[in-house]
Regions:
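Short beta-strand element of the alpha/beta-hydrolase
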Residues: 197-209
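Short alpha-helix in the alpha/beta-hydrolase fold that links the catalytic acid
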Residues: 217-218, 375, 389-398
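Acidic catalytic loop of the alpha/beta-hydrolase fold
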Residues: 383-388
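Short beta-strand/loop motif that positions the catalytic acidic residue
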Residues: 373, 379-381
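Hydrolase active-site cap/lid region
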Residues: 246, 309-356, 409, 419-420
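Cap/lid segment of the alpha/beta-hydrolase catalytic domain
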Residues: 208-280, 337-345
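C-terminal catalytic histidine-bearing segment of alpha/beta-hydrolase fold enzymes
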Residues: 394-445
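N-terminal cap/lid segment of alpha/beta-hydrolase-fold proteins
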Residues: 37, 41, 150-194
Length: 445
């Protein structure tokens, strides 16, 4: 159990000029700034953990300090009155694997960066394991799903798409019929004069939602991916089989009607579980990509953020042709976190009651599917991400069969990077985004 200072006694001292830790991390809040003694927020059992509050004269007289374990359990909630200065507000010894979230700000700020400073820590992430175990027939189940899908001959409809981003790249609107549900839809692009067997494949999957710009395939994005390295076969596949390039009212209507609340739809079995066909569309897209004569026959890189990370993890687990994967704060990784007494991953409806869905969800949980993947892997987790908790991401990472894998944590990252203050985003770009981009660029050279 972590050791906590007696705050009443401690706060008799209005200010203590503690030396800045050599690897201190900082979060932004206009009135106060939290700081921890670990650059990446990762600790081992037995390590000392310290949290300071740097209080400005603009800080309101009364602030609330909270400590939460595994994004479920408040272990400390205390009102504080601090004079301007730097104050040690928490100290202890890490005694077990756990994710901590520290919040200092206005009462009831609820992790709002505009009202509080927030920082996270994770202890012994390498020991964390998923809530669900792999079903004995996991491989057989997906092999049967692929066999049924492939009974339908692979056909593709390609429509040239004019683009001005790179004159050396050709781009097409892509549609591939499926035996069930919506077709695969997206864009494919590659260099005009590429040699046979010269290009890797890169597939982008999209985050959750329907009408948002982040949910839709973009010509600019696929052309940019096709231009990477010495050129690639780039696919940008949307999650739902939506038409590309439609007026916004088309996507608004889908979100309000046919696809409303899709991530929390109930189901009776595999057949009506929405994510089954979402994952199969990813495989079908790859089935098409590997038929292109420009493919080098070896490299397949897939990446995505949030729900896109779920799709990327699924494809890496289901399909051994995937050789490298980048998972960015991935969703649907350890939805059964409650089995380990921690918050489970998105989708929230399923993680709130993992026992109810235990006969179906293990076949789709990325933490389970990654047990079948030997792909080279780079994974990112945010230590204050309540949508895709870092303990869940760590559990999935640990469960991956890959022996060439890297995970990075960032102590101030919530689920959406643009919610971090500007100075923190700059640090994140240097410490997380830069190595993430290098991982991709090195692989695609």
């Amino acid at each position: 159990m972590i050791i906590i200072f007696d705050m009443r006694r401690f706060l008799i001292c209005a200010f203590l000029a503690w030396a800045v830790a050599p690897f201190a991390s900082f979060a932004q809040y206009t009135a106060a700034v939290l700081e921890i003694n670990s650059k990446d927020g990762v600790y081992a059992v037995g390590d000392s953990i310290k949290v300071w509050a740097n209080v400005t004269p603009e800080c309101e007289a009364v602030q609330e300090f909270t400590v939460q374990e595994d994004m479920l359990h408040d272990i400390l909630k205390q009102e504080m009155r601090l004079a301007p200065g730097r104050h040690l507000v928490y100290a202890g010894v890490c005694s077990k694997p756990v994710n901590y979230v520290f919040t200092f700000g206005k009462s009831g700020a609820d992790r709002d960066y505009k009202k509080a400073s927030i920082v996270g820590a994770i202890v012994a992430p390498e020991t964390m394991r998923p809530g669900y175990k792999a079903p004995k027939d996991l491989r057989k189940f997906w092999d049967n799903q692929l066999k049924k899908m492939r009974k339908m001959p692979l056909e593709s409809k390609l429509t040239p798409v004019p683009q001005e981003y790179n004159p050396d790249i050709v781009c097409f609107d892509l549609e591939i019929p499926m035996p069930e549900g919506a077709p695969v839809r997206g864009y494919v692009a590659y260099p005009k004069n590429a040699d046979l067997k010269s290009l890797p494949i890169i597939i982008m999957a999209h985050a959750a939602g329907v009408k948002g710009g982040w949910c839709q395939c973009k010509v600019e994005s696929v052309v940019k991916n096709a231009s990477r390295g010495k050129g690639t076969i780039a696919l940008d596949i949307n999650a739902h089989g939506m038409l590309n390039g439609q007026p916004q009212k088309y996507y608004d209507s889908l979100e309000a009607n046919e696809l409303k609340g899709y991530s929390s739809w109930d189901f009776t079995g595999h057949k009506d579980f929405y994510f089954r066909l979402m994952y199969l569309r990813m495989v079908r897209a790859l089935d098409y990509a590997v038929t292109l004569p420009q493919w080098d026959g070896e490299r397949v890189f897939v990446y995505g953020e949030s729900q896109g990370g779920a799709q990327a993890a699924a494809l890496a687990g289901i399909d051994s042709r995937v050789t490298a994967v980048n998972l960015r704060v991935p969703a649907f990784i350890d939805v059964a976190g409650l089995y380990q007494n921690r918050k489970g991953s998105w989708p929230g409806k399923y993680s709130a009651d993992p026992k109810k869905y235990a006969k179906i969800l293990p076949y789709y949980d990325g933490a389970v599917l990654l047990s079948m993947s030997r792909a080279k892997m780079f994974v990112e987790a945010g230590l204050v991400d309540y949508t895709c908790p870092p303990s869940c991401v760590a559990a999935g990472f640990n469960n991956a069969a890959s022996t060439d894998k890297t995970i990075v944590f960032f102590p101030y990252r919530p689920h959406h990077e643009n919610r971090m203050p500007k100075d923190i985003r700059k640090r994140w770009s240097e410490e997380v985004k830069a190595p993430r981009e290098k991982f991709r660029e090195d692989y695609l050279q």
